[in-house]
């Protein structure tokens, strides 16, 4: 009986000829410090080989139309099933995607409204539910005798025939924002008070406006309401004006039609042909809910069918939990002959909905735009879609499924994983969360360190065996809850350095709130998924503080922000740095420019005639001509995926062989070239550059941030979310930050419990330099180390959106209403 996948000689990324067995039909966890090779083993070997072999069974013609993974660098992988991967960061969907379309729940709901609802005849009467709809027959109205075709499921889709004609199925319209048309009312119209006339229209519109009876030589605020109405909405009348050009002394008479300020913007919007033109216009626009469909995206005809007294638009506005209860009652309201069909449609809806509710997404409404969902919510949608089909014999590879999950939601996630195994599948997950790791039947730990010092299996076995293994780094964290490692402020001294006060109106699911955040402290915002953490901090506090510090108008829903002494807001999120391979750790950390100058001053460079600019791998003379300084070349192979290989000439160094002739006497006694330095990790380069003050200081900051394992030449787009966040912080360390607020969005993504301790040290150093640090987080180690906690909830969606408790970790633990408190 084959009971495990056998991997022999895996060399993907930093894996060092790894030989390991991965048990089938169980949950296998892969743990290890950041950069130790976990994802390389799970995604780079298991998923790459599992999906590639499945696709190779298809015809060449079919494969041509699919993106394919290249063959993994491994000697052999035996007994690997067809594989599906759920990536750490699902792509952000477009404007047309909603929670309903993304989960495909809307398909079942549209079918329900098409087949089971009461349909409206052309004269406005409703026909009782009938099987004639499913039989694709015309309906006859019992009141007026009109015959008509009922709408099919496709005619109820807002991305198809059921789209609202006004907003084209997006639920949003762009309208002119009157507040932007005259930004400074102290100016006269002659001085350019009406902004769109300055940028989108001929300057002579001022003369036409004068001919309309508006005084153009007094401050705009002093105009009468009638005059202002003419400026904003005046009629398109033709006026005879005397016009004098500003640039010359030429003058003349002409007839010209008046374009009011609003029409000027509308006219310019209609004529936009490119992005540049759109940029000129969009500053005068604001997005608003469509007045015709009320944001439901559906046409009047698509909103017409009635089931249990409501339309499709109203059903989509319910939360998933409410909607499930409503769907349960549908068959009972129909004639007996329709109930078997109704039960079948409703069951398909309930099966899909149950998975999503198990994963803690019951608070979301079907009409919620997918682009407003958090990473964790999108990942759980992806997981629910993958497990819905009750397949067997599939390998599911999950990359950090605990991202964005509150400890209380993890129970539902582990339940889904056990269901997959019960159906005869195998689950491999990469994670750091000890709560999830404890659910695994087998654990493989990678290490011992990160980067070049990692890539080996340092421990494997059951959870009990790992706990006893002296080589294991995760073992101690599986055994016991980790302790508090920083000195926390007491409740009495919490606000000694001052406070930031925020008041907001209702937005999304968040009710009107008033919160105080202590300055110079570590504040952690907690709460179950969907409780309003992101809305409170990223959509209210960040734009509110930014507006307050720059003297701009507060966003509409932000009622009040008081932040005395705060001058800058720094959002450190996990978005990748750069989009192309030309951005490296050395260029981003401002080390590369310094190194180029140093190498240009060497005797070798002077002899060969090289200047600092020549050492640039992007534009310099010394860049490799074969790969143009990227270090890789793409091979376009017909019928196969593009193959990206290290450049055969420079072997990935990005430099021509002449660059190796310029040597610098390093502090460790060796002579090294710039390509040699770029190939070193930060810790090694620190030793080599010990006598270069500026370079040493910048590299030391990166090492202190726990990034010593990254090589200087590593591409920044390939860094994990946690690495990207810490690299962005590098330029902020060491400065006085008493006027700064740092906001982190789940910074522990991808961090091992040991790395979380490094992160807490980083927070402490920022606080020691005077900064206020605010963190949105689910990680219990970070929560336990907070000075102040703002716990949102109590539930998600409509059941959340309020502040349940505020205070020290001890006060939150004692708060009966706090779900987070139960886990501290």
Task: List where the protein language model places each region.
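Conserved phosphate-binding elements of NTP-dependent enzyme cores
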Residues: 1-824
């Amino acid at each position: 009986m084959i009971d495990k996948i056998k991997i022999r000689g895996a060399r993907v990324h930093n894996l060092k000829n790894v030989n390991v067995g991965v048990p089938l039909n169980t949950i296998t966890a892969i743990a290890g410090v950041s950069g130790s090779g976990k994802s390389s083993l799970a995604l780079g070997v298991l998923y790459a080989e599992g999906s590639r072999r499945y696709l190779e069974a298809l015809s060449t013609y079919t494969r041509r139309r699919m993106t394919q993974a290249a063959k993994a660098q491994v000697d052999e992988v035996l007994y690997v099933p067809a594989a599906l991967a759920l990536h750490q960061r699902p792509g952000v969907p477009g404007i047309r995607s909603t929670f309903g379309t993304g989960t495909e729940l809307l398909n079942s709901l549209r079918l329900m409204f098409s087949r089971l609802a009461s349909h409206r005849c052309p004269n406005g009467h409703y026909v009782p539910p009938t099987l004639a709809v499913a039989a694709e027959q015309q309906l006859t109205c019992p009141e007026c005798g009109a015959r008509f075709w009922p709408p099919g499921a496709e005619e109820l889709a807002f991305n198809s025939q059921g789209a609202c004609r006004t907003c084209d199925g997006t639920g949003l319209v762009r309208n002119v924002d009157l507040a932007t048309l005259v930004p400074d009312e102290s100016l006269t119209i002659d001085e350019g008070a009406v902004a769109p006339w300055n940028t989108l229209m001929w300057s002579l519109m001022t003369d036409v406006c004068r001919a309309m009876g508006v005084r153009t030589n007094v401050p705009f605020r002093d105009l009468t309401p009638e005059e202002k109405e003419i400026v904003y909405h005046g009629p398109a009348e033709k006026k005879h004006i005397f016009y004098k050009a500003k640039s010359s002394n030429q003058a003349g008479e002409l007839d010209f039609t008046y374009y009011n300020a609003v029409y000027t913007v509308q006219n310019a919007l209609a004529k936009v042909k490119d992005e540049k033109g759109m940029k000129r216009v969009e500053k005068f626009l604001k997005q608003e809910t469509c007045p015709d469909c009320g944001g439901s995206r559906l046409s009047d005809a698509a909103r017409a069918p009635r089931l249990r007294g409501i339309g499709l638009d109203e059903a989509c506005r319910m939360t998933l939990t409410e909607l499930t209860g409503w769907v349960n009652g549908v068959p009972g309201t129909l004639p007996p002959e329709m109930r078997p069909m109704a039960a079948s449609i409703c069951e398909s809806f309930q099966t899909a909905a149950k998975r999503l509710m198990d994963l803690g997404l019951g608070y979301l409404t079907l009409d919620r735009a997918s682009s407003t969902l958090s990473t964790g919510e999108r990942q759980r949608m992806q997981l629910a879609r993958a497990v819905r089909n009750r397949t067997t014999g599939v390998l599911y590879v999950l990359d950090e499924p605990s991202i964005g999950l509150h400890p209380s939601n993890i129970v539902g996630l582990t339940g889904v994983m056990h269901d997959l195994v019960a159906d005869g599948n195998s689950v491999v997950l990469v994670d750091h969360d000890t709560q999830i790791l404890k659910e695994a039947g087998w654990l493989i730990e990678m290490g011992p360190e990160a980067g070049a010092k990692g890539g080996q299996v340092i421990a494997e076995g059951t959870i009990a065996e790992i706990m006893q293994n002296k080589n294991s780094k995760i073992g101690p964290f599986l055994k016991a809850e980790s302790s508090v490692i920083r000195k926390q402020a007491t409740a009495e001294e919490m606000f000694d350095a001052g406070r930031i006060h925020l008041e907001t109106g209702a937005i999304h699911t968040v009710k009107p709130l008033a919160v105080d955040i202590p300055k110079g402290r570590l504040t952690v915002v907690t709460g179950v998924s969907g409780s309003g953490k992101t809305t409170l901090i990223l959509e209210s506090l960040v734009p509110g503080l930014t507006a307050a510090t720059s003297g701009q108008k507060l966003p509409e829903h932000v009622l009040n922000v008081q932040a005395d002494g705060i001058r800058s807001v720094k959002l450190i999120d996990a978005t990748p740095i750069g989009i192309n391979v030309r951005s490296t750790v050395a260029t981003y950390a401002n080390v590369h420019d310094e190194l180029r100058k140093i190498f240009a001053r060497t005797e070798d460079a002077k002899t060969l005639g090289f200047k600092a600019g020549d050492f640039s791998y992007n534009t310099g003379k010394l860049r490799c001509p074969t790969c143009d300084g990227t270090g890789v070349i793409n091979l376009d192979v017909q019928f196969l995926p593009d193959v990206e290989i290290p450049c055969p000439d420079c072997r990935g160094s990005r430099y021509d062989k002449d660059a190796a002739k310029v040597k610098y006497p390093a502090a460790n006694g060796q002579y090294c070239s710039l390509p040699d330095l770029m190939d070193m990790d930060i810790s090694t380069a620190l030793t080599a550059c010990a006598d270069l003050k500026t370079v040493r200081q910048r590299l030391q900051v990166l090492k202190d941030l726990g990034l010593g394992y990254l090589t200087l030449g590593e591409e920044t787009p390939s860094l994990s979310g946690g690495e990207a966040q810490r690299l962005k912080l590098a330029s902020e360390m060491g400065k006085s930050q008493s006027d700064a607020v740092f906001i982190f969005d789940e910074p522990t993504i991808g961090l091992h419990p040991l790395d979380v301790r490094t992160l807490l040290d980083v927070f402490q150093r920022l606080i020691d330099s005077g900064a206020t640090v605010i963190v949105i987080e689910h990680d219990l180690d970070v929560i336990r180390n907070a000075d102040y906690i703002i716990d949102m909830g109590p539930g998600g969606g409509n059941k959340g959106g309020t502040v349940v408790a505020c205070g020290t970790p001890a006060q939150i633990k004692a708060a009966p209403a706090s779900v987070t408190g139960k886990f501290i």
